[in-house]
């Protein structure tokens, strides 16, 4: 051993090949400050040793997952000069790796992402095993690569390929990385290190020109001027079409690669550093890094819960159709066999067909095979009676959203399943404590609220009733995680968390329409300016105005002081006219099927006529007022949920909003949005609209936080 630290060990073989092994104490390797300092010291030792070549490897199942993102928010709060010092020093280390006086190779297994990918780019050769995933995901955090990724990758695989990698932030499979020249070989895991050392021996024997490889990475890009101009112009258009104005990092990446194309390594790195620092200081980066950290927190809680959980080996869903079929597909495709029970054969057929349709789409996209599809379908057992449920560990009730029907079904199933089987209800609004009254043992009962479409929406709300045991909660959280979902635990109340905060937003929208607002103009502002994937009118059409009408009544009963209403609103107008939204072709908008078989929406003059009859002449509203009147009620209700303990933390609330409702990720969720705006500024804005009713009244705790210049997340 010629060098040893807690994170890196370097040993020299008899053939004078140095083996630099990343092996941090935790479960993964990452480039935190300690590891960067260790790498710097290790490279100094290597340079002065009698090594003839070096292989970079990992003592973990994965190579390096990237920089330590937990350090980012505090680091990015530093002054620009401090941030420049950190990034410049990191690049001194990576340059030192690239400049070693002998050939180098990376032996890559598992993830080599972000800084991990930039480390392998600094070596002369790269060998990956079949488990490898390589990529530069920094744009997903509102950043660009900062350890030389925008400099080395374009010179290695060409500007077009590099920009696709960097601007999408996608992980690359080893075979795809090999095709474009990002790596030099793909081998079986058991042959990885031997193949890497063979490559070094070939370089030492003159069969591979490691110096030419290195020189190419450090030289300007070789692109004719006209071709370069066309290439970067095209890239900007394509990237902006996807990223839009709210996500500046992908466009910044294109500009950096373009600006640095004709520069040396040293000059190009300065361009990268400056752009990185500028992005690191944006609210978008803070929001996206916050989402990443919140996601880790939620998943960490789920992992902890799994230690208390029952082992779910076999599941059941009651109620087939689209929702039941989606739950069955999700469970079976992630390895948990499931019984799908319904009283109606046609509903069972619909559920199985829904699962088959989703699996066929996976096969068509090359993400699955016919054999895997058959295996998943074999894991779904349709049933018209309860007999196959006697051995299941968990039952998810997903029948019609009617408390009497649900109570009857829950009582029936409790008499069939094992005494220790868990029973969960997929309800969006009905009180878990109310439903629990139909059970003899409410301790094994909780809510498990999936979002539609099940296969696309990542969130599951796990709702704890007053009698629900911790083992039940932990087991359902573990099952949701096993299904590939992100579970958040919330306490029981009308609407639980997500729907409770959604309907005040709809109330704000209804208020605007009652005052003469144009629903299409409101949608445009909320989509294009605020950043929602759908505006409120379009969202109501997709959810279904019958569903919205029912849920709104539940919320009004639950919170009459704030959500009760005496006058007819726009949802009532549409519902009473039989306009149910996308499901029957007319809601606020009218719908037809386009050439690709997808629903196409158009403004319907009949909607405007009905709304004018109900509320009078149309009136134009400024974008700021539209945003304020829709968002203030949602924000205050979200804060109330935290204060009442419905949701445990700002992080979990924000993840619920982003994953359950599509809250704009670049804003980070309600609590990140509040901190960015300043709680005092929000309180002042809400007070301006306080005359609109209880939904616009901030809480006393919010006022106190505002007066103390406080925040919901710790200040960096």
Swiss-Prot record:
Pfam families: 3HCDH, 3HCDH_N, ECH_1. GO terms for molecular function: 3-hydroxybutyryl-CoA epimerase activity; delta(3)-delta(2)-enoyl-CoA isomerase activity; enoyl-CoA hydratase activity; long-chain-3-hydroxyacyl-CoA dehydrogenase activity; NAD+ binding. GO terms for biological process: fatty acid beta-oxidation. Pathway: Lipid metabolism; fatty acid beta-oxidation. One of its GO terms (cellular component) is fatty acid beta-oxidation multienzyme complex. Residues 1-188 are annotated as: Enoyl-CoA hydratase/isomerase. Keywords: Fatty acid metabolism, Isomerase, Lipid degradation, Lipid metabolism, Lyase, Multifunctional enzyme, NAD, Oxidoreductase. NAD(+) binds at residues 323, 342, 399-401, 406, 428, 452. PROSITE patterns: 3HCDH. The active site is at residue 449. The record marks 118, 138 as: Important for catalytic activity. It catalyses: a (3S)-3-hydroxyacyl-CoA + NAD(+) = a 3-oxoacyl-CoA + NADH + H(+); a (3S)-3-hydroxyacyl-CoA = a (2E)-enoyl-CoA + H2O; a 4-saturated-(3S)-3-hydroxyacyl-CoA = a (3E)-enoyl-CoA + H2O; (3S)-3-hydroxybutanoyl-CoA = (3R)-3-hydroxybutanoyl-CoA. Substrate binds at residues 295, 499, 659. Residues 310-716 are annotated as: 3-hydroxyacyl-CoA dehydrogenase. Its EC number is 4.2.1.17, 5.1.2.3, 5.3.3.8, 1.1.1.35. Heterotetramer of two alpha chains (FadB) and two beta chains (FadA). In the N-terminal section; belongs to the enoyl-CoA hydratase/isomerase family. Involved in the aerobic and anaerobic degradation of long-chain fatty acids via beta-oxidation cycle. Catalyzes the formation of 3-oxoacyl-CoA from enoyl-CoA via L-3-hydroxyacyl-CoA. It can also use D-3-hydroxyacyl-CoA and cis-3-enoyl-CoA as substrate. This is Fatty acid oxidation complex subunit alpha. It comes from Shewanella amazonensis (strain ATCC BAA-1098 / SB2B). The gene is fadB.
């Amino acid at each position: 051993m010629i060098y040893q630290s807690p994170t890196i060990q370097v040993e020299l073989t008899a053939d004078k090949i140095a083996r630099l092994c990343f092996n941090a104490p935790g479960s993964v390797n990452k480039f935190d400050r300690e590891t960067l300092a260790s790498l710097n010291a290790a490279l100094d030792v290597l340079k002065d040793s009698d090594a003839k070549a070096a292989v970079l490897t990992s003592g973990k199942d994965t190579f390096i997952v990237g920089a330590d993102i937990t350090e980012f928010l505090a680091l990015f709060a530093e002054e620009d000069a401090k941030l420049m010092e950190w990034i410049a020093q990191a690049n001194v280390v990576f340059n030192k790796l690239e400049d070693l006086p002998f050939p180098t190779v990376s032996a890559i297994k598992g993830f080599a992402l972000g800084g991990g990918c930039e480390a392998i780019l600094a070596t002369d050769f790269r060998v990956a095993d079949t488990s490898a995933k390589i990529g530069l995901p920094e744009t997903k955090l509102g950043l660009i690569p900062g350890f030389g990724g925008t400099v080395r990758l374009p010179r290695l695989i060409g500007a077009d390929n590099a920009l696709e990698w960097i601007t999408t932030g996608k992980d690359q499979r080893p075979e795809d990385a090999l095709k474009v020249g990002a790596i030099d070989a793909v081998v079986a895991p058991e042959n990885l290190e031997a193949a890497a050392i063979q490559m070094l021996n070939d370089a030492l024997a003159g069969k591979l020109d490691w110096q030419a490889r290195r020189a190419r990475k450090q030289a300007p890009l070789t692109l004719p001027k006209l071709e370069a101009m066309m290439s970067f112009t095209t890239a900007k258009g394509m990237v902006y079409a996807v990223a839009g104005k709210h996500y500046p990092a992908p466009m910044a990446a294109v500009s950096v690669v373009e600006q640095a194309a004709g520069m040396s390594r040293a000059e190009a790195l300065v361009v990268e550093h400056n752009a990185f620092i500028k992005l690191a200081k944006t609210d978008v980066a803070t929001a996206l890094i916050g989402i990443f950290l919140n996601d880790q927190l939620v998943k960490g809680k789920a992992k902890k819960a799994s230690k208390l959980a029952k082992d779910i080996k076999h599941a059941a869903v009651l109620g087939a159709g689209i929702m039941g079929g989606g739950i069955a597909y999700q469970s079976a495709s992630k390895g948990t066999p499931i019984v799908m029970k319904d009283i109606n054969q046609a509903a069972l057929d619909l559920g199985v067909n829904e699962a088959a349709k989703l699996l066929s789409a996976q096969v068509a996209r090359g993400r699955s095979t016919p054999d895997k599809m058959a295996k998943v379908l074999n894991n779904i057992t349709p049933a018209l009676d309860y007999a196959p449920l006697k051995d299941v560990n968990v039952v998810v009730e997903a029948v019609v959203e009617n408390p009497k029907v649900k109570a009857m079904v829950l009582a029936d199933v409790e008499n069939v399943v094992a005494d220790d089987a868990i029973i969960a209800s997929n309800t969006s609004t009905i009180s878990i404590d109310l439903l629990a009254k139909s059970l003899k043992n409410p301790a094994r009962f909780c809510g498990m609220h999936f979002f539609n479409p099940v296969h696309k929406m990542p969130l599951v709300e796990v709702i704890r009733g007053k009698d629900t045991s911790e083992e039940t909660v932990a087991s359902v959280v573990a099952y949701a995680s096993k299904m590939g979902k992100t579970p958040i635990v919330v306490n029981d109340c009308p609407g639980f968390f997500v729907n409770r905060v959604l309907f005040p937003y709809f109330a704000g929208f209804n208020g605007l329409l009652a005052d003469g607002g144009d629903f299409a103009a409101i949608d445009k502002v909320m989509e294009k300016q605020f950043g929602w994937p759908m505006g409120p009118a379009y969202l109501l059409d997709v959810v279904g105005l019958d569903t919205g009408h029912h849920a709104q009544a539940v919320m009004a009963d639950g919170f009459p002081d704030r959500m009760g209403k005496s006058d007819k609103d726009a949802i009532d107008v549409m519902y009473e006219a039989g306009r149910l939204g996308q499901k029957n072709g007319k809601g606020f908008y009218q719908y037809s099927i386009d050439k690709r078989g997808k629903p196409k929406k158009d403004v319907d003059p009949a909607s405007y006529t009905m709304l004018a009859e109900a509320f009078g002449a149309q009136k134009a509203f400024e974008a700021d007022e539209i945003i304020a009147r829709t968002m203030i009620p949602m924000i205050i209700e979200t804060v109330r949920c935290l204060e009442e303990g419905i949701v445990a933390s700002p992080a979990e609330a924000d993840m619920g909003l982003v994953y359950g409702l599509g809250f704009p990720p670049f804003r980070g969720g309600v609590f990140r949005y509040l901190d960015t705006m300043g709680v005092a500024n929000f309180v002042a804005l809400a007070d301006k609209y306080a005359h609109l009713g209880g939904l616009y009244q901030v809480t006393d705790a919010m006022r106190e936080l505002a007066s103390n210049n406080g925040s919901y997340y710790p200040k960096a």
